Amino acid sequence: MEEKPSKVSLKSSDRQGSDEESVHSDTRDLWTTTTLSQAQLNMPLSEVCEGFDEEGRNISKTRGWHSPGRGSLDEGYKASHKPEELDEHALVELELHRGSSMEINLGEKDTASQIEAEKSSSMSSLNIAKHMPHRAYWAEQQSRLPLPLMELMENEALEILTKALRSYQLGIGRDHFLTKELQRYIEGLKKRRSKRLYVN
């Protein structure tokens, strides 16, 4: 059973070079796609597909996709498979397609259940949010440091920046723009610190 699909895939790869062929260029492809939408599986190919007779031969040779090498491939396939086997092959493909469509339906049900779960969790989080402070306020409260620790960190930062300023003044000069920029930054930190200390 696994050999048949591999033969079909080999033959379909041989046909891919033709620019003029249509999407439904193969009788087997037409049979498979039409039987998926038909209630009766034993309809003759001539009733289902235009351009084919009762035996599955192409009636219209004017399509331009039939080539001399192609005829030998089709004849080899027809010689190796009887019409009953073709029907069995179509039934196997139909079953495979039904299985994959059922998997798709199951996947849709899974996504629907996930959406429902997300809705219920978001509703419960809305109920919790009514009783809790705003998220931004909560994040600010969590990131706020105690005042003595903040003062300690500011003192260490000012000490490090002052040492860097001295090395800049000695290394690159007092008139360099990086030295002036660092000096302005340190003065700004000192002003903010003094304002906060005088307010408290």
Swiss-Prot record:
**Localization annotation:** Cell projection, Cilium, Flagellum membrane
Principal localization reads membrane
Annotated GO CC locations: CatSper complex; cytoplasm; sperm principal piece
What keywords were assigned to this record? Cell membrane, Cell projection, Cilium, Differentiation, Flagellum, Membrane, Spermatogenesis
Region of interest (Disordered), residue spans: 1-31, 58-78
Topology of this chain in the membrane: Peripheral membrane protein
Sequence intervals crossing the membrane: none
Q: Which GO terms describe its biological process?
A: flagellated sperm motility; male meiotic nuclear division; sperm capacitation; spermatogenesis
In this chain, composition skew of type Basic and acidic residues spans: 1-29
Keyword Nucleotidyltransferase on this protein? no
Quaternary structure and partners: Component of the CatSper complex or CatSpermasome composed of the core pore-forming members CATSPER1, CATSPER2, CATSPER3 and CATSPER4 as well as auxiliary members CATSPERB, CATSPERG, CATSPERD, CATSPERE, CATSPERZ, C2CD6/CATSPERT, TMEM249, TMEM262 and EFCAB9. HSPA1 may be an additional auxiliary complex member. The core complex members CATSPER1, CATSPER2, CATSPER3 and CATSPER4 form a heterotetrameric channel.
Q: What does this protein do?
A: Auxiliary component of the CatSper complex, a complex involved in sperm cell hyperactivation. Sperm cell hyperactivation is needed for sperm motility which is essential late in the preparation of sperm for fertilization. Required for a distribution of the CatSper complex in linear quadrilateral nanodomains along the flagellum, maximizing fertilization inside the mammalian female reproductive tract. Together with EFCAB9, associates with the CatSper channel pore and is required for the two-row structure of each single CatSper channel.
Task: State what protein this is by name.
Answer: Cation channel sperm-associated auxiliary subunit zeta
- Gene for this protein? CATSPERZ
